[in-house]
Amino acid sequence: MINRKILLTSLLLIFTVLSACSREKNTCRVVKISDGDTLTCLTKGNKSIKVRLAEIDAPEKSQAFGQKSKKTLSDLVYQKNVRLARKGKDRYQRTLAVVYYQKQNINLEMVKQGMAWAYKQYSHDPIYLQAQENAQAKGIGLWADNNPIEPSQWRRQEKINMAFDYQTFPSSISLFPT
């Protein structure tokens, strides 16, 4: 009986220590806002982490509502200690995470305020789509625009525009030499 109590107490202590270490590892201070869905934070050991907010896609900086989205994220978390619920890495090796400030889901808050879309391609939680539908119905944030363009569509169009701009292509250069 005593051995069992010692074992249970030991296991409880180990899990408590591991939990505390995990919380500390996932806590950081936001030191930079890149745009409405990307931030940089520092851990207690001064390790820099670039974080891409999971489940959402915010307008690009040069897109309509891009600067407002960036400012909204800044107002919510800049210079604040946040907790990261990590989801892995994206193709640019940024940490994908749900960001929490004082138990508030910041990713979800960005969608609620109409400053980001639920990222349908990568979203696994229906609360983001519900929040988007609510913001859209109320005309909040980017939903006040007559024709809001999803960032993924906007990026595709920008690539096409940059790939070949007939307006600026020099007329002295022949595309089809004879």
Swiss-Prot record:
InterPro entries: SNase_OB-fold_sf, Staphylococal_nuclease_OB-fold, Thermonucl_AS. The keyword Signal applies. Residues 1-19 form the signal peptide. Transmembrane segments: none annotated. This is Uncharacterized endonuclease HI_1296. The active site is at 52, 60, 94. Its EC number is 3.1.-.-. Belongs to the thermonuclease family. Coiled coil: none annotated. It comes from the Bacteria. One of its GO terms (molecular function) is nucleic acid binding. Keywords: Endonuclease, Hydrolase, Nuclease, Signal.
